[in-house]
């Protein structure tokens, strides 16, 4: 698989906030909005949020980026009201969090493209993966299933029909190379490459760890894969609350601004 065609979408993130075109820096009640906190995982998600924060500052909006090192805490912080938005996850992950925690988080927009890929320090294709190799995948429900689905698309395993990104190890119906599937916290996956043959790694951790997509990656999710598209999330109660929430001003102005991360 050639990776050059993926370089632009991987390294250029576009996060559209409706703040361009604002005539002033006050909300509809005539008050200057207080500090708005947006949660993001370290790496490209936080970089995009920081770039947006600079643009928001021009509109009189104090957007503070709160960085997290794991996948679960940003949603907990949002559900608890400690932050007002977060930008780091795909819809299935958010929906699973809602189901597991009885929360009501909703997506209000798309942010950046973050494909998961298969990475290795020793092999360059699925065909090169040796018999009995240890293969690492994320240990959270949706991204773990996403990793298994990617292994299936690469032809390394076969899964039960229809399971998709909801797959678990129990859904593997064929494993011709007798791969040993090891589930690890997503943030640990880049470091695991010294100990495993292949790891299915989300792109934000690929970039934050400084992995080389072209040299270490050999199979990537397609650009139109729904779970590769990240979202901007808020609490359901705040979704349309432009007048009473300080961050409503972010979405109440005409136009949008695109932030490029290279």
Task: Label each residue range with its predicted role.
Residues 108-157:
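A conserved helix-loop-strand patch within extracytoplasmic ligand-binding domains
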Residues 65-76, 164-191:
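Short helix-initiation/N-cap motifs at beta->coil->alpha
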Residues 31-43, 61-67, 134-135:
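Short, well-ordered beta-strand elements
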Residues 141-166, 248-262:
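Ligand-binding clefts/hinges and TM-proximal coupling segments of bilobed small-molecule sensing domains
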Residues 96-108, 122-123, 195, 200, ...:
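Ligand-binding "clamshell"
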Residues 110-119, 207-244, 248, 262:
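Periplasmic-binding protein-like
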Residues 43, 69-71, 81-95, 112, ...:
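Beta->alpha turn/N-cap motifs
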Residues 1-35:
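Short, low-complexity disordered leader/linker segments with a strong preference
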């Amino acid at each position: 698989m050639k990776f050059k065609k993926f370089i632009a979408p991987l390294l250029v993130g576009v996060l559209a906030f409706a703040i361009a075109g604002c005539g002033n820096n006050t909300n509809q009640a005539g008050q200057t909005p207080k500090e708005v906190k947006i949660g993001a995982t370290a790496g490209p998600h936080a970089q995009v949020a920081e770039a947006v924060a600079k643009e928001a500052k021009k509109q009189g909006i104090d957007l503070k980026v709160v960085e997290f090192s794991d996948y679960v805490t940003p949603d907990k912080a949002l559900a608890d009201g400690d932050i007002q938005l977060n930008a780091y996850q795909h819809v299935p992950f958010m929906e699973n969090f809602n189901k597991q925690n009885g929360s009501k988080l909703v997506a209000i927009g798309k942010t950046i493209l973050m494909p998961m890929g298969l990475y290795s320090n020793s092999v360059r294709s699925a065909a090169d993966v040796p018999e009995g190799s240890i293969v690492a995948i994320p240990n959270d429900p949706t991204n773990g299933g996403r990793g298994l689905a990617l292994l299936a698309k690469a032809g390394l395993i076969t899964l039960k029909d229809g399971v998709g990104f909801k797959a678990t190890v129990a859904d593997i119906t064929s494993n011709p190379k007798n791969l040993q599937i090891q589930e690890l916290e997503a943030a640990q996956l880049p470091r695991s490459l010294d100990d495993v043959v292949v790891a299915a790694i989300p792109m934000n951790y690929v970039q934050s760890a400084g992995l080389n997509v072209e040299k270490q990656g050999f199979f990537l999710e397609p650009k139109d894969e729904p779970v590769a598209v990240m979202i901007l999330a808020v609490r359901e109660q705040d979704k349309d609350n432009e007048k009473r929430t300080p961050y409503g001003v972010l979405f109440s102005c005409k136009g949008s601004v695109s932030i490029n991360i290279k």
